[in-house]
Regions:
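Conserved G/P- and acidic residue-centered "switch" motifs that form tight phosphate/ATP-binding loops
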Residues: 118
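Post-Walker A helix-loop "phosphate-sensing" segment adjacent to the P-loop in P-loop NTPases
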Residues: 129-133
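Active-site-proximal beta-strand elements of phosphoester/diester hydrolases
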Residues: 217-220
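The feature captures the ABC ATPase H-loop/switch
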Residues: 121
Length: 250
């Protein structure tokens, strides 16, 4: 059977005078296309409004999937790492954060691999007890490059250093790569069971992996926006996710 990839949704929160309660749920198009190209089945999974149903629903979803993919999206609510909201924090969705945290814990308990992109690496870090810079420009003194780049997502804008011997370095086959950049938040204190394996020139965390297992790999950039045109090699992180799933299904 083809691997089934669970992808949590975002919701489009806008006032619609015709259908005021119609909040379309969606997942990133290029993420879906990457998995289809590689022979996997993307399953879009939506979060409930009622947070009392989150834990059971997360357990039910994890039984249906072979791996959990955490895509980009809105900022993570700082409530989940014990902070007040910074003046420059963007939109947050409490139910989404609560749901994805439950999905992460359920997936790890079921020995099912996780792959995170952008917000995905951030919510994984928070779920494991880590913290975030709520706004790099305001809170990160060593900032030297623009991380929320104002350009098309398929184009690389800055370099990333990959840790020698890390999964990321092995996948890309070199110690430095060039990536796109579409974020204003980043990993601060690293969560339990995680390690940093990629950094930007100014030290901002760009990649993380599990310390003792192969269950998690995450990147801060958006490989899904680059593989179709500018950098086909960016598919390697998607293929690695499927390879990890295959290993855990045996």
């Amino acid at each position: 059977m083809k691997p089934r990839i669970g992808i949590p949704t975002d919701e489009l929160i806008e006032i619609n005078p015709i259908m005021p309660n119609n909040h379309p749920a969606y997942a990133p198009h290029d993420v879906k296309e990457a998995f289809i190209k590689l022979g996997a089945i993307p399953l879009i999974i939506a979060f409930p409004d009622d947070v009392s149903k989150v834990d059971q629903l997360a357990q039910d979803y994890v039984q249906l999937i072979d791996g959990l993919m955490l895509p980009g999206g809105p900022d993570v609510d700082p409530t989940f790492y014990g902070e007040e909201p910074h003046p420059k924090i963007g939109m947050t969705l409490y139910q989404k954060d609560r749901f994805e945290s439950a999905l992460i814990k359920a997936a790890l308990a079921a020995d099912k691999p996780i792959f995170g992109i952008c917000r995905g690496i951030q919510i994984m870090n928070v779920a494991m007890g880590g913290t975030l810079y709520q706004d790099l420009e305001s809170q990160y003194p060593e900032l030297k490059i623009q991380h929320p780049q104002a350009t098309l997502g398929q184009f690389a804008t800055h370099h990333v250093e990959l840790t020698a011997g890390s999964k990321l370095a092995k996948l890309y086959g070199r110690s430095t790569i060039k990536v796109n950049s579409r974020h204003h938040q980043a990993v601060k204190a690293v969560g339990k069971g995680l390690k940093v394996t990629a950094v930007a020139p100014d030290g901002v965390v760009e990649g993380m992996e599990s310390t003792d297992t192969d269950l998690f790999l995450g990147v801060q950039w958006h490989p899904e926006n680059m593989w179709q045109q500018e950098d086909p090699q960016q598919l390697v992180v998607f293929q690695d996710f499927l390879d990890r799933i295959a290993a855990h299904r045996k």
